[in-house]
Amino acid sequence: SLSVTDSGVFLMGDTRCAFYDNAGQQTGMYAYTGTLVGGSSENGKAALLFENETKRRSSLVLLDSVGADPRQIDFDMVVKNVHVMDENAYVLTKVGMETYSFDGTQKSSVEVSDSYDDFLRIDKYLFLFGYDKIDRMDFAN
C-alpha cells in the first residue's frame, strides 16, 4: 500500500512499513511482529491491524510520520477493520466502533451489531457495510 502526502510517502509492505520525506530519506520504520491483516494511512499517520488467530485477538499499532514511538492497543477479540480518517483511527469490532487518537487515547465508542464488515465515515455520518445491507448512523467525534 502506498500513501502520498505533501510532506512525503508512507509505504506499507508485507513485513514492515516506512515513512519517507520528499527528499527520499526514511523518517520512520516499523517492522511487524505479528500477522498483518489490515491497515490504513492518511496525512502521515498510519494504523496497522494485526491478528493472533490462535488466541482470537487483535492488536492495533498507531504510527505517526514524525517518528513518535508506536502505540499498541490490544483487543480481546478479532477486529474487523480499521481506517484512518480526520487524524483519528476508527476501529470496527464485532460489538462496536471505537475511535482512537494517535497518542493511543480512546476518544469515543458506540455499539453496533456484528453483521458489519467494513465502514466509511463521511462528515458526521458513519456508513456501515454488511453482506447485503448498508446502514447509516450519526457519529461525531
Predicted regions and their residues:
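C-terminal structured domain segments
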Residues: 96-116
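Structural motif
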Residues: 14-20, 55-62, 96-101, 133-140
